[in-house]
Structure formats: structure tokens, C-alpha cells
Amino acid sequence: MVSTSKIKSVDFYRKIPRDLTEASLSGAGLSIIAALSMIFLFGMELNNYLAVSTSTSVIVDRSADGDFLRLDFNISFPSLSCEFASVDVSDVLGTNRLNVTKTIRKFSIDSNMRPTGSEFHAGEVLSLINHGDETGEEIVEDSVPLTGRNFDTFTHQFPILVVNFYAPWCYWCNLLKPSWEKAAKQIKERYDPEMDGRVILAKVDCTQEGDLCRRNHIQGYPSIRIFRKGSDLKDDNAHHDHESYYGDRDTESLVKMVVSLVEPIHLEPHNLALEDKSDNSSRTLKKAPSTGGCRVEGYMRVKKVPGNLMVSARSGSHSFDSSQMNMSHVVNHLSFGRRIMPQKFSEFKRLSPYLGLSHDRLDGRSFINQRDLGPNVTIEHYLQIVKTEVVKSNGQALVEAYEYTAHSSVAHSYYLPVAKFHFELSPMQVLITENSKSFSHFITNVCAIIGGVFTVAGILDSILHHSMTLMKKIELGKNF
């Protein structure tokens, strides 16, 4: 049986009676410094243990979300009408989707980007069957040519004024011309302007009356506008826009359209109508809407290959003057991939505090052409997309996000100008992994801090004590 004395012999911490120890002022000072150092270093170690540390690596893209990528956008075009705004998508694999509408919404806006109503619905804009009468007869011009000087007079004089805004070089305008003039003749015979005075058909040459056409926000030719008592303002379910005709363009269809507009209007006695014409026009005159722009928003699924998102004016029955098109725009939002949920985004930022500075790089940026760049200006954006994946310490993928860099430029186009977003995905991805920390490592470091400081302080105290003792002995030797 092992005796108690033998067990005591392995004691590392043998006690010295307090009566045999001696306290000193220098030792007390070192003890205070050592205690403060222990507390400070322990706090630093605890902070380091609680802090999140990550490691970043670049690996080959291992996306698990398939071959398609979600693209969300919200872009405002102050000079492009929703009537003709078209969203197109193409890629290097041959995909070419024109005028995407299923997941796209359009809202008319004014020049200050303010919405002028609810969602824009174009209806059957581009589904014309007849573009005009096929005739070889000589065209007799019966429609009234309008200019900037007499336009307001005619719009106030007639309760219904149907105007064809055209350009002589336009193919569709030339197809419309015979049926338009024949319809004008039939309407003039049916509703005599002098005796009836309810309706008249007119035309405006936009190559000669550019200011007048711009004032009425004419962007495509031909544009058939309907003016009622001096204004073409249409108020439909809080949506304010220009009233236009989108139907067939043969003579019969045009006449039928005009008759449907005139029939609800009560025919006044001729003299009374002439007497009250100016008063009625002043009372019922409405300010023309400043609805010349469009906000296009929505999403689409694009393939993970280099591709293009383009917004331009497009129509199967209109022509456009490229020199008058202005593709200025404001990118309200543009992002790739699924949106990060708010509860995950806070964790996302916690693991990577610097991530997100380049997220949605184009958001809020304006690209305005003040006509100082000349005509036919295409605005291009080159986007390089990199996927970033954040993985927690337990191996769980927290979130997958797509960030991009953006470089923008302008180019003079030989064709119709567009707003073009070229996107290209990197074959590599950034992997951010949370580093796990061992609690045993933390305890080891704390013990090392306490023991190390205590030992170093003891060594310093011993050196200081022996130095002072030696100095006292030297002084005593000198006195003898």
C-alpha cells in the first residue's frame, strides 16, 4: 500500500509558509501588470474565437440549378413608347426570342420617370391582316394636310379628328396611302365638313413637321391618332395615353372605325355649332399627356451561355426613323439568379462582410443621350457574371448569388438603335467557406496565455529582485 508521504512527494505545487516569503513593491507592480495583461490577452483570444473567419477559393462552377439562369430587370426609357417597346433575347446557341411578353410588364411614364397610369396593354397592335388597298388607280388626296400652324385650329374645330402621321419614305405608309385617301373621300361625302362638322380625316408629314410629330410623341410610322375636342388623351382605368387606331388599314375598316366614332356624337344645328365651337373647345380642351416613355420590368430564364438582352422599338406594321430614336434609359434594377431571402441575406453578410458591394452594379445608374452624341446611338452594357457560393462550417450551402461587373459604352448603329445588355458567365465560381474553430484549441490558448504571462512576470521579478540585492551589496561594500 502506497503511503501518504510518497504521494505527497509528486506534488508539483509545494507550499512555502507565508512567514518565509517576503513581499516587495516591485513584485506588486509586476503582479498588477501581469493581471491586466492576462485579462487583455484573454479578451483578445475570446474575440478571435467568437469572430467569423472564412476562406475563399476559386473552383470550377458546380451549379446545381440547371442550365438556365433567372434574369430580373426594371428599366425606364423616357423616350421609348410602350406602344413599340420590345424585349428580345438571344444567345450563342441560336436562341432568338423576339418581343417577349409573357413575363414582361410595361408602364407608361413621363419624361421625369413618373408613371402615368396602370399597366400598359397594347392589345392587337401587331396583328394586322390588311395593310391597305391594292389599287393601281391614281390617288386623289382628299385628306387634309396639317402643319404646325393649323393643327390646333383643326383639332379644336372638329369633335373628332383622325390624323395619319406618316413619312414619305415609309413602306407601310405608302401601303396605307390609297385606302386612307379613299376613306377620307367617303367620310367627307358622308359627313360634310361644312354642313355636318363632326369629323374629318387629316394627315401630317413628319419629315416636314418634325416638331409637331415630336410634340405628339410620334415614334412609328404610320401612327393613326384620334383627337376628341382638341386632345388625344385616353383615360382608361387610370391609364393615361394617346388614343390610337391599331386595326386593319383597308378602306372599309377605316370607314367603319370613323363611323363608330361619329355615331355617338349628337348632330347640332349648323349655326349653333358654329357659334359655340370656340367656347366648347376652350371648355373641353385637355392637356396632352406627356406619356412618351415606358418602364419595362419583368424576368426571364436565359441559358448559361453568352447572350444578349435587347430593348428596342419593334413593329410588324410600322417603320421607324432611326435618327429620331433615343434609347436613353435608367436601370432601376438588374440582377441574375434567385433573389436572396431577407433572413438569409443577414447571415450572408455576416459570413462575408465585403460581399455585396458589387451586387447589382447597374442599379440606379442613368444612361442619358442628350442628343450630343448624334443620331443612331446604341447604348451597350457588357456584363461579366461570377457565381458566389457561401458554405457554412457544417457543410451546408447557405446561399448562391450571382455578382457581375459592368462596362458601358455607346456606338453609332447603321440600323435601328437599341439598348443592349451583353452578359457572359464565368466558368469559375467563388467558394466562401466558414472556418470552424475548436473549443479545445481555445482552452489551450487561454492556458498558454495565463501560464506564459505568469512565468514571464516571475522571471522579470526574479531578475529585478536579484539586481536590486546586488546593488545594495555593492553600496554596503563601499561604505566599509
Swiss-Prot record:
Acts as a protein-folding catalyst that interacts with nascent polypeptides to catalyze the formation, isomerization, and reduction or oxidation of disulfide bonds. Disulfide bonds join 170-173. Belongs to the protein disulfide isomerase family. It comes from Arabidopsis thaliana (Mouse-ear cress). The record marks 249 as: Lowers pKa of C-terminal Cys of active site. PANTHER family: ENDOPLASMIC RETICULUM-GOLGI INTERMEDIATE COMPARTMENT PROTEIN (PTHR10984), PROTEIN DISULFIDE-ISOMERASE 5-4 (PTHR10984:SF76). It is a single-pass membrane protein. GO terms for cellular component: membrane. The keyword DNA damage does not apply. GO terms for biological process: intracellular transport. Pfam families: COPIIcoated_ERV, ERGIC_N, Thioredoxin. The active site is at 170 (nucleophile), 173 (nucleophile). Coiled coil: none annotated. Widely expressed. Induction: Slightly down-regulated by chemically-induced ER stress response. Glycans are attached at residues 74, 99, 280, 326, 376. It is found in: Membrane. Keywords: Disulfide bond, Glycoprotein, Membrane, Redox-active center, Signal, Transmembrane, Transmembrane helix. Its main location: membrane. Residues 120-263 form the Thioredoxin domain. The keyword Transcription does not apply. The chain crosses the membrane at residues 439-459. This is Protein disulfide-isomerase 5-4.
